[in-house]
Amino acid sequence: MQKSTRPANPGDSRKWFLVDAKDQVLGRLAVVIANKLRAKDSPSFDPSVDAGAFVIVVNAAQVKLTGKKEQQKDYQRYSGYRDGLKHFTAATMRRLHPDRIIKEAVWGMLPKNTIARKMMTRLKVFAGPEHTHAAQKPEVITL
């Protein structure tokens, strides 16, 4: 009987990808990012192995929301205290923390486990066009 094979742990050989979020629809962009973080495009994909790539997102403040989501989409934050639930619209979130819009969309597309928390540490989101990871020579993804 043949034993099932497991993909090797990538170690330091993870790839780096650069995505420009300018004028990209948020959900479609988040799918591409989540698939790169999970390595779902890899032929040796295994959901229990953290073998994904690093993803750098620039121009997060200029991501596009369709329909009336700019005014109607609701983000919540809870402090842990009574009456500590705060609500923010997408327009407010874009003004205060434009990186969190993309991070929360990608988080919603990942499994809720410890591997997903590790994957989220490999997501680097920047509000403007500059990023601090030029030394890694990221490969540009065009959407």
Feature locations, PLM:
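Ribosome large-subunit tunnel/peptidyl-transferase-proximal elements
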Residues: 1-104, 114, 132-143
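Hydrophobic, well-ordered secondary-structure segments
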Residues: 102-103, 107, 120
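C-terminal structural segments of small proteins and small subunits
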Residues: 110-132
